[in-house]
């Protein structure tokens, strides 16, 4: 049974123009790209409104292999950030593992990353894309994100007014930035414990609407080596994962307030346990771990270090990267080769207020780091008691709630910053796994009656039953492709053919080259002019423009045929092997190498170049 709500429907458009018009139409109706799956239909049917929702069946990517991409990264940012729309990607119909990998690759080309999830929701958050991998049909994160987004019109207007733009220097740094939403409801079963530790009185729920809701901030970028030994910036591919003051999310919640229940001995008692109490759950510890799946990536820097309890501090976690062009664009602009010419400090604001918890950092390997906020002040049930003994008439609940800071059970938001590095020539991919967990513990205390013929008194005792604790973890992961063009460190440029009014060099899925209408958001038309003078394809960084075969991109090498140099004060691009200029037929656009003078009348050797924006922020509105 299909959802009957009004929406557009796109299967395979016969031409790019029709598809592009549909993608950029900006209608408030729901829009489908591909047939909805039964599971996708069921998830969306429960929504009150599908206004501003784009449904994408990942199977469409398989059917369109070799075709022009459905959507560029810049178009995705435009629709989600400027117009307030949301993209729901459904992978559930792709069950074959090799085909699943192909669809993940397509998502990497669109967004820079991919997830091992059946569904991924893409929305906006603080001026960047927010990715929410969904763990199942009934994952509450889906509904929470959808409900958080108000009407399309209001959302779009707000984003246009308050879109968070990075500082000018950072905006010029080639990087891919996004937020990762980690949202997990803690089930009733996970927070249900015995009502009494002394008697069999059944179980009860020790939490009230518990959940883990965190927003991690992720940056993918390249640092080029710059400076002298000792102070030089690293020559490395960088992945930075943070929970800072610009991200963090709602935090980890167990309870809004702490309540307690009482159990009384139901038999005549002279000496023994008279009563026990069960107080709502708090966190014995919070733990956060980040791990790379292979040795391609290693931890370069991580914060916080070990911290004492009752520690309050704010700091800036800075990291210097070597960049090309510095804060200002290189004087040669897009004709400049890739080389480090300045340092740029990328900063994160971190705040610590440990209160009852100490922080322990652990790095069991070069690929893994973990941070634990471990209860240190009043860490045991015994230490929470305000009295040790009393008369038999003084029996009652004795846990001092003033010794339990709210951080122990509600709104806990950590701050941390982890930077991974990979070799500058690293290839393949790495999965980054993030675990966010809380160790839930009820507080059990009891009253023991001591009888000694001539009198009696009671003692208050606390219990540390480790079997009555439970760790709940929210796990997520994302895959990074080390061949992504952002890791070259260069700003992408195009090659525009001067014999036409508006034609640029473009590569197809089989690496064939042709002249097409210029599009500054197209990865197929984007190249990195690297330190060797090669034009490396941003669509596939293993392929380069080769003067020995100008009809098709070739595997990159250091051959002179792949090295190019701009003639001074001109629009002429010279090949270092042939010592001839790149030219093209003014009718067909076919490329060739020609002498500087005496060329046929139908040939132009004028080539222009300008920056493209395949992973930069959208144009201002």
UniProtKB/Swiss-Prot annotation:
One of its GO terms (biological process) is cytolysis in another organism. GO terms for molecular function: carbohydrate binding; toxin activity. It comes from the Bacteria. One of its GO terms (cellular component) is extracellular region. The keyword Signal applies. Residues 1-30 form the signal peptide. Belongs to the HlyA hemolysin family. This is Hemolysin ahh1. It comes from Aeromonas hydrophila subsp. hydrophila (strain ATCC 7966 / DSM 30187 / BCRC 13018 / CCUG 14551 / JCM 1027 / KCTC 2358 / NCIMB 9240 / NCTC 8049). The lineage of its organism: Bacteria, Pseudomonadati, Pseudomonadota, Gammaproteobacteria, Aeromonadales.
